[in-house]
Design a protein with these regions (language model features):
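Active-site neighborhoods and metal-handling regions in enzymes and metal-associated proteins
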Residues: 1-149
Length: 149
């Protein structure tokens, strides 16, 4: 609010442990424990436009498997961001990230879409999924998830 936000874009999500990988996971009575993945998903409305940001961290020290998962997801996200260009099908953008996740052995855990546009509404078109053949346009405001396995 101090910087001009007028509202939250959506209810903030905080999920730990197994629930940290669930799209739109909700908090339970489970206590956050050392070694848990913790996913925070939040956003605000500023000058009439929505934002949406997600971060996943490990509480305490990450083990080797957690580092592998984190780095795989990060690589998928950054590679897809680098690949996006006007004229590209949304399904192609999704495919860039999905291939990295699948090649790392986590494809069956990638049930959520890669991302979506944001604007006046928190979820706008185009969205990034294997079935969406909409084309990325100059001027789209895009959000690629990092919490998708």
């Amino acid at each position: 609010k101090k910087q001009g936000a007028t509202a939250l874009s959506f209810d903030t999500i905080s999920a730990s442990g197994i629930r940290s990988a669930m799209p739109h996971g909700i908090a339970t009575d489970k206590k956050i424990e050392n070694g848990d993945f913790l996913t925070l998903d939040f956003g605000c409305v500023f000058e009439g436009y929505c934002s949406d940001m997600t971060r996943t961290v490990v509480v305490g020290k990450a083990n080797d498997k957690q580092k592998e998962i984190y780095n795989t997801v990060l690589k998928a996200q950054t590679t897809a961001i680098d690949a996006i260009k006007a004229g590209m099908k949304c399904s192609e953008v999704d495919g860039v990230a999905r291939k990295i996740i699948t090649d790392a052995g986590y494809g069956e855990n990638f049930g959520h879409s890669l991302g979506h546009s944001v604007g006046i509404e928190i979820h706008e078109n185009p969205s990034f999924s294997p079935k969406n053949n909409a084309v990325v346009q100059n001027g789209n405001v895009l959000r690629l998830n990092r919490e998708f396995i």
